[in-house]
From Swiss-Prot:
Involved in bacillithiol (BSH) biosynthesis. May catalyze the last step of the pathway, the addition of cysteine to glucosamine malate (GlcN-Mal) to generate BSH. The keyword Ligase applies. This is Putative cysteine ligase BshC. The lineage of its organism: Bacteria, Bacillati, Bacillota, Bacilli, Bacillales. Residues 460-484 form a coiled coil. The keyword Coiled coil applies. Keywords: Coiled coil, Ligase. Pfam families: CC_BshC, Rossmann-like_BshC. Belongs to the BshC family. Its EC number is 6.-.-.-. GO terms for molecular function: ligase activity.
Length: 538
């Protein structure tokens, strides 16, 4: 594996943050400098965490996932007041979801290792599974290539309900069939049987979406020391009760902090992405097997436009009695993470970085400082046959990342023809229509009754010209079919659906192509934190 770094243009908050623009960096509490990380350690030393209770829970949870010895030792290390975490999180996508989930974990592992060495303190990697999420449409699918098209393959749950991913039971037989259908779209390799067995071993131990995700990730990273946490685990929720109470008692200040920070973002020229109602409480409550967002209504806490209503005392009482019924929204999830873990750094994708820029005053409302927010490592895998296609078309390896592949294709095709087809036909249509306009005027003067027919005649002529243009283009494309197929393969591999590879394709394709140790080989590489995109040549 060889790594090539490419500067890919970014926009908005992410671009300015990575370029060191002071205005947007002022929306975060720490710069990404070594001095800032040292200061973060000092700041964390002044806070108290329920470390022993957390260790007890994480030992039980990670042992259940059959964690390796390195993970168990890292969990135990969390009991020491001089141990800190690098953390990232993601929803529990089936088969681990898009590649960027894997890349987030690799980012966490690398940064934890680097900071442990440079700061001289114990730093452990943690991955937060968003078990409270109830939007199944975001986690119940993957993309495959079928009949020369990219298709979204959805796992249709026979018993769908608005429950969280931690509580949504998987039909193992149905899921197994869905997985087999996905693997049928992959080429049969020497690794296919082993990868299917690897996935099925995790599936057999699972009851829910989060179980399956957790088992698969732990199996994939078993020797890395990675600690997994299910954010909606009932035992973890018990530990979070004091902070849920704090949020409920300060929900107005939390909302005010959010709105004030969003005003700052607007003044800097950015568009806020977090949308909330003015009476938001920022906590979900499970009611009748549904996750319901609570809102304020004249001092009462209501859900579903008043269908459910609780007093402050009733809500606090319910939190103490059934903490597993409560969960965070996009605003309070980062706060809960900060409450639970001694967070040296949070690693996020571009979208997360943008919405965290809206949370600074929310953190301050609770008495927290935002942890250093580090953009995750971005990666694209360049297979040998795709590299050959690029070479055959005389394209640079960076071209698909800096240009629209369709545009590259059009430019290449235009260069194969002396005169561009589009321009020639536009010119011809213009000349013919000018002549026809004059002809229509002549017809109208002699016989006005034929004016409508003359207009239809113009339409028919235009139709025939466009038909000729389409046929010519089709024949030209047929003539260059071999080369154009190379463009299609490049687009499917590197920019599927016009998006980055890591936002569409799933890691199982690469395990099937290169073996179960594929992720281990990627982890052996050292990635830079300079904001550049990493292209790994396979």
């Amino acid at each position: 594996m060889e790594i090539k770094e490419i500067s890919v243009p970014q926009q908005g908050v992410v671009a300015d943050y990575m370029n060191g623009k002071k205005e947007i960096q002022s929306c975060f509490d720490y710069m990404l400098t070594e001095d800032a990380f040292k200061q973060r350690v000092q700041d964390l030393r002044e806070r108290e965490f329920f470390r022993q209770d957390l260790v007890t829970h994480l030992l039980e949870y990670n042992t259940k996932l059959q964690a390796g010895e390195a993970t168990i030792q890292n969990v135990k290390a969390l009991g020491d007041e001089n141990t800190y975490v690098v953390i990232a999180g993601q929803q529990a996508g089936l088969l681990t979801g898009p590649l960027y989930t894997i890349h987030k974990i690799i980012s966490v592992l690398q940064l934890a290792k680097e900071k442990e060495e440079s700061l001289g303190v114990k730093v452990v990697p943690v991955f937060w599974i968003a078990g409270e999420d109830h939007d199944m449409d975001e986690i119940n699918h993957t993309f495959v290539t079928k009949n020369k098209k990219i298709k979204k393959t959805i796992f249709h749950d026979r018993n769908p309900k608005k429950a969280s991913a931690s509580e949504s039971e998987l039909s193992l037989e149905d899921c197994r069939k869905w997985i087999e259908e996905i693997f049928k779209t992959y080429p049969e390799t020497n690794f296919t049987k082993d990868v299917l067995q690897f996935v099925d071993d995790s599936l057999r131990k699972s009851n829910t979406y989060v179980d399956f995700f957790g088992h698969l990730i732990m199996k994939m990273f078993v020797n890395s020391g990675l600690i997994l946490v299910d954010s909606h685990h009932p035992e973890l929720r018990k530990l979070e009760v004091p902070f849920f109470k704090q949020i409920v008692s300060k929900y107005k200040e939390v909302q005010e902090g959010l709105l004030n920070q969003q005003e700052v973002i607007k003044e800097l020229g950015y568009k806020p992405i977090i949308e909330t109602k003015s009476n938001a409480v920022h906590i979900f409550m499970e009611i009748d097997n549904e996750r319901v967002l609570l809102e304020d209504n004249q001092g009462e806490f209501v859900g579903k436009d008043g269908t459910y209503s609780f007093s402050y005392e009733e809500l606090i009482e319910e939190m103490e009695r059934s903490p597993e019924r409560f969960s965070n929204n996009v605003v309070t999830r980062p706060l809960m993470q900060e409450y639970v873990f001694p967070t040296l750094a949070f690693i996020g994708g571009p979208g997360e970085l943008a919405y965290w820029s809206e949370l600074q005053q929310v953190f301050h409302t609770i008495g927290f400082r935002m942890p250093p927010v580090v953009p995750r490592i971005t990666i694209t895998y360049l297979e040998r046959d795709i590299a050959t296609d690029l070479h055959d078309l005389q394209l640079q390896e960076s071209d698909p990342f800096l240009n629209n592949v369709d545009k590259l294709r059009e430019n290449w095709l235009s260069n194969q023809i002396e005169e561009p087809i589009d321009e020639r036909f536009v010119e011809a249509k213009k000349e013919i229509m000018n002549i026809h306009t004059s002809l229509q005027q002549f017809v109208k003067e002699i016989d006005p009754g034929l004016s409508a027919f003359a207009g239809k005649n113009e339409f028919k002529i235009n139709e025939q010209i466009e038909l000729l243009e389409r046929m010519l283009k089709r024949n030209v494309e047929k003539k260059h079919e071999v080369e154009l197929n190379k463009f299609r393969r490049i687009q499917f591999a590197l920019r599927p659906l016009g998006a980055p590879q890591e936002r569409v394709w799933n890691v199982c394709y690469y395990l099937n192509q290169f073996g179960l140790d594929f992720v281990d080989h990627v982890m052996e590489k050292t990635f830079s934190w300079n904001g550049k995109h990493h292209v790994i040549k396979l």
